[in-house]
């Protein structure tokens, strides 16, 4: 069971370019995290976001192709599975012009109570917002 794919398109800004004249590898991770946050915000209420937060347990990222200033990219993200307080989120960053995969990544997230910062089981209410049956 996985979630629908959340998509976000953007243009590579000058601030993302490194000394090798392509996107700095750390920036891709930042874009993945931005997409995860946007997906969370798009599905949840303000009240839910005040009750719960997510923290990263680990990241895995694989760089497939470089990208450059001014290119249009699309970040795709989806939740592949979850159990207890943990959720595995996947990402692809794809160049719009030729559909080449630039980055593939996975993040293991932990669901927390926003007041105590203790891990808490992902509620049915939250999982139903994201997961396809």
Question: What kind of region is each of these model predictions?
Answer:
Residues 1-58, 112-133:
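Hot-dog-fold acyl-thioester-processing enzymes
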Residues 2-4, 68-69, 79-133:
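HotDog/MaoC-like acyl-thioester-processing domains
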Residues 9-11, 60-62, 76-78, 92, ...:
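Residue-level recognition of well-ordered beta-strand positions that form the cores
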Residues 39-87, 103:
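Hydrophobic beta-strand-centered segment that forms part of the acyl-chain substrate-binding groove
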């Amino acid at each position: 069971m996985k979630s629908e794919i959340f998509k976000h398109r953007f243009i590579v800004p000058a601030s993302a370019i490194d000394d090798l004249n392509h996107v700095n590898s750390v920036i891709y991770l930042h874009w993945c995290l931005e997409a995860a946050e946007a997906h969370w915000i798009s599905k949840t209420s303000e009240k839910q976001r005040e009750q719960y937060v997510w923290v990263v347990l680990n990241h895995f990222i694989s760089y497939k192709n470089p990208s450059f200033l001014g290119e249009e990219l699309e970040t795709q993200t989806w939740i592949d599975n979850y159990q207890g307080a943990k959720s595995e989120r996947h990402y692809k960053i794809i160049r719009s012009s030729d559909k080449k995969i630039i980055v593939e990544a996975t993040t293991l997230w932990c669901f927390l109570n926003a007041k105590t910062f203790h891990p808490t089981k992902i509620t049915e209410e939250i999982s139903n917002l994201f997961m396809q049956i």
